[in-house]
């Protein structure tokens, strides 16, 4: 069985006749990077939210959608929407505190993430002073700190300049190669991204 699989999957919002999401067939293998491409309004974000197991989406489903991942990190399109604390170091450990990680283990995990992402110069910074690229870097680092098997990124570079966007995609490939995390990315465009991914799925 594929790590993530959909067959004739449809999702309908309440009182809607046409599906917000339709996927005839999708198979995503564990440890790969998959790019979902499609225009605005085609259902990419709704599909990602369903893959992430979000329970707050009301609606009706048809067909099958299965996800074998244990743990999922979700990175939003707008870097500011995800940051909830005022210090970079606090942001990284926020999720670890929520799952009740022991203090010493949390310190070790923080040190590992800082080293892996090269955050030594940012760790004591106020999150409000970070650039858009630095904020998205922090969001990805915070998600990976939770040791997820799956990372979902919803247009993670849409609000970044080309240099910052390239750095984020280099980082995504590095994460995949070093940690084996399965990564699903949604974008509106295909240009310049083919080299970063293993498979492209069009919606």
Which residues fall in each region the model found?
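A short, flexible loop at the N-terminus of ABC-type nucleotide-binding domains that lies
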Residues: 1-6, 10-23, 55-58
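H-loop/switch region of ABC-family ATPase nucleotide-binding domains
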Residues: 187-188
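Conserved ABC ATPase "signature" region
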Residues: 104-122
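Conserved ABC ATPase signature
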Residues: 126-130, 134
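Hydrophobic anchor residue at the start of the ABC signature
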Residues: 140
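Conserved catalytic motifs of ABC-family nucleotide-binding domains
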Residues: 147
């Amino acid at each position: 069985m594929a790590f993530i699989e959909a067959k004739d999957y449809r999702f309908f919002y309440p009182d809607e006749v046409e599906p917000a999401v339709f996927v005839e067939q999708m198979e995503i293998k564990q440890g790969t990077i998959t790019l979902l491409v499609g225009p605005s309004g085609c259902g990419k974000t709704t599909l990602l939210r369903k893959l992430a197991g979000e329970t707050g989406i009301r609606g009706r489903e048809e067909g099958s959608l299965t996800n074998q991942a244990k743990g999922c990190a979700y990175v939003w399109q707008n870097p500011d929407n995800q940051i909830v604390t005022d210090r970079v170091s606090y942001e990284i450990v926020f999720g670890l505190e929520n799952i009740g990680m022991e203090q010493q283990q949390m310190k070790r995990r923080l040190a590992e993430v800082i080293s892996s992402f090269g955050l030594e110069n940012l760790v004591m910074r106020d999150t409000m002073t970070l650039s858009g690229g630095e904020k998205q870097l922090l969001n990805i680092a915070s998600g990976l700190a939770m040791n997820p098997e799956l990372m979902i990124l919803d247009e993670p570079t849409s609000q970044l300049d080309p240099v910052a966007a390239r750095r984020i995609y280099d980082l995504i490939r590095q994460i995949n190669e070093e940690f084996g995390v399965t990564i699903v990315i949604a974008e509106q465009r295909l240009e310049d991204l083919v080299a970063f991914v293993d498979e492209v799925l069009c919606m």
